[in-house]
Each structure stands twice: as C-alpha cells, then as structure tokens.
C-alpha cells in the first residue's frame, strides 16, 4: 500500500465527490465479470489524484489470484509495487487512492471490509472503496458505489473498544459507520460521441418488452440472504441479552452477600466480637467481560442494505404491474 498523503490540497481528508473515468469503470466491470462470475470475491487497486475535495480515479489494476499455499501478503505487496513502478515509468497516475471489490447481492458489510478500509484511510486519509455488484447490474441498474469510514468510526476503531457505552457516547449507529460518497462517471468528448453513435445504430427493442415483469429469482435470493442475516442478528442480540442477565444476576448476588455480611457483623458486635475482616469483592465477583457490539452494527447495516434492495426491486415490479393492469383494463 502506498504510504503518505497523495495531495496537499485537502488537509482535512474531506472528500465530497468521487469522479471515475469511464475506462476505469469498464476495467472494474470486466475484472469482476471474468473473475467473479462464480460468486468469488475479486479486489483491485484504485489509482488517481486529489483535487481540492474531489477524488479523481483515473486507473486501476486487479489483485492477483493467490493459490493455496502462496505467501499472499508478500506476493500482493511485491505485485502492487511492481505495477506502480511500471506505471510511474510511463508517466501514468500511480498514486494509491483506494481499492475496489465485487459483491454478491450486496453482501459486503463485514469485518474484512472494515479492517481493510481502516488500514487504507489510516495510511491515505482520502482513500475510498468502490463496491460493484454484477448481479444487480445485470438487472439493468449499474451498481457502483463509493464508501469510506466516518471520522467517528475511525476514532472508535483506533480505540478498539465497541461496547454499548462507547458507541452511545460516540453517537455511532449502523447508519453512521460508513459514509457514501456521491460518484460520477466522466467520459472524454470522443467517448461521448461514440456512445451517441452506438445508441443510434443499436436496434430498438420491441415495444412490448418494457412491461415485462422481472423474474422472482432475484427477489427470492435477496429474501433468503435477508433471512440469514436476521437470524445471525437475533443470535447476536440473544448473546448480549444473556450478558445483561448475567450482570444483573451477579449484582444481585453481590448485594445479597453484602447484606448477609452486614447482618453478621451486627450480630458479632452485639456478642462483643470483632467484625469480619474486609474482603476484596472484586476477586469474589469478577467483572464480566463486556461483549463487543461491532458484529451487531455490521449485521444491522447488512440487513438494512438487503431491505433497501427488496424495496427498490418491489417498487419497480409493482409499478410495471399496475401499469400493465391499467392498459389491460383499457384494452378490454
């Protein structure tokens, strides 16, 4: 990974917009379609520059596919350094500004993404991650989004404590973990002319296809992964509830012990005996380890993402359905 800052024009690391070259988008799509066609995760490096609060992504290259038994870390670092050295030799933008990865049905909110993006932003403050979903794109919607960790999440991750109290004090919820940056795709003038020419020469599809309802397999897959994530979220919530019950039970045991001890001391004093010696209650009632709420945050955000996908898909399908029904009624 490249170290140091890639620009002096954005001292705060604030990025308001991400601008991606059309050719770079095609490279990302080509890599994800070829290497990730079977659902495998593919990743790559983003190169570019920073102008004020705009991050311009002008090039990219994929991570190599490591086989079992390879020294992946050393190979990846050597590969990246060699590619960037060759790009620098031919005067191509070689500044490391982030990374990209593919996803399946939006299943990208996990610890791996969080750890990787934290490492990138710690080294290069303005870096982002691009998420591309080939399956949703095949449904007619180019799904390419840019994310970065919020400043609050970066501070909390640095401390390494994700207890409920820490999250509450920091004001972090699953909505504020990641910050989505507006993304625009920029093409050259010649590219725009070519696209217009291709659009004019492309045969017009049959007029009766615009009301074709989408297949239910996509919705079925989304609902299935949504149910799996909800089950995991329920299990994580049950673990935290068990912890809370254990804390309450331990506190009750501690209060009962102190009450019995106080009664015993009063009885000993009445009999003219010395009270019981002081004891270290922290050894008798050891504090229970506070469970991390990080998994709960990630699962909540993942469930929210699945719900948004189902909502968008259902809205489009219902719109077509009602329009088709109105046309059919008018025809009759």
Curated annotation (Swiss-Prot):
Pfam families xrefs: eIF3h_C (PF19445), JAB (PF01398)
Subcellular location: Cytoplasm
Domain annotation MPN: ranges: 18-153
Gene Ontology cellular-component terms listed: eukaryotic 43S preinitiation complex; eukaryotic 48S preinitiation complex; eukaryotic translation initiation factor 3 complex
Keywords: Cytoplasm, Initiation factor, Protein biosynthesis
GO molecular function per UniProt: metallopeptidase activity; translation initiation factor activity
Record-linked InterPro entries: eIF3h (IPR027524), eIF3h_C (IPR045810), JAMM/MPN+_dom (IPR000555), JAMM_MPN+_peptidase_M67A (IPR050242), MPN (IPR037518)
One of the GO BP terms on file: translational initiation
Disordered: annotated span: 251-285
Family annotation (PANTHER family): EUKARYOTIC TRANSLATION INITIATION FACTOR 3 -RELATED
Family of this protein: Belongs to the eIF-3 subunit H family.
Role played: Component of the eukaryotic translation initiation factor 3 (eIF-3) complex, which is involved in protein synthesis of a specialized repertoire of mRNAs and, together with other initiation factors, stimulates binding of mRNA and methionyl-tRNAi to the 40S ribosome. The eIF-3 complex specifically targets and initiates translation of a subset of mRNAs involved in cell proliferation.
Oligomer and partners: Component of the eukaryotic translation initiation factor 3 (eIF-3) complex.
Protein name per Swiss-Prot or TrEMBL: Eukaryotic translation initiation factor 3 subunit H
Upper taxonomic lineage: Eukaryota, Metazoa, Cnidaria, Anthozoa, Hexacorallia
């Amino acid at each position: 990974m490249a170290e140091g800052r890639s620009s002096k024009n954005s001292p705060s690391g604030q990025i308001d917009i991400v601008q991606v070259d059309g050719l770079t988008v095609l490279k990302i799509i080509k890599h994800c379609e070829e290497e990730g066609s079977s659902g495998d995760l593919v990743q790559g490096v983003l190169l570019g520059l920073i102008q004020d609060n705009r991050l311009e992504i002008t090039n990219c290259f994929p991570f190599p596919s490591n086989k079992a038994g390879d020294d992946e870390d050393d190979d990846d670092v050597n590969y990246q350094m060699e590619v960037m050295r060759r790009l620098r030799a031919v005067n191509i933008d070689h500044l490391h500004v982030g990374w990209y990865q593919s996803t399946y049905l939006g299943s990208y909110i996990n610890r791996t993404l969080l750890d990787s993006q934290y490492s990138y932003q710690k080294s290069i403050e303005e870096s982002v991650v691009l998420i591309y979903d080939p399956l949703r794109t095949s449904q007619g919607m180019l799904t390419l989004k840019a994310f970065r960790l919020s400043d609050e999440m970066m501070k909390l991750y640095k401390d390494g404590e994700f207890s409920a109290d820490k999250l509450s004090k920091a004001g972090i919820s699953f909505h504020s973990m990641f910050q989505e940056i507006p993304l625009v795709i920029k093409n050259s003038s010649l590219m725009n002319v070519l696209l217009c020419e291709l659009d004019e020469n492309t045969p017009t599809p049959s007029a009766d296809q615009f009301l074709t309802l989408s297949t239910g397999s996509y919705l079925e897959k989304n609902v299935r992964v949504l149910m799996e994530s909800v089950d995991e979220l329920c299990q994580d919530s049950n673990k935290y509830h068990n912890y809370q019950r254990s804390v309450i039970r331990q506190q009750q045991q501690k209060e009962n012990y102190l009450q019995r001890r106080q009664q015993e001391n009063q009885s000993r004093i009445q009999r003219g005996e010395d009270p019981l010696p002081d004891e270290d209650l922290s050894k008798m009632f050891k504090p229970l380890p506070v469970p991390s709420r990080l998994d709960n945050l990630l699962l909540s955000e993942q469930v929210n993402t699945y719900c948004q996908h189902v909502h968008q898909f259902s809205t489009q399908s219902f719109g077509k359905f009602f329009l088709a029904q109105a046309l059919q009624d008018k025809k009759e």
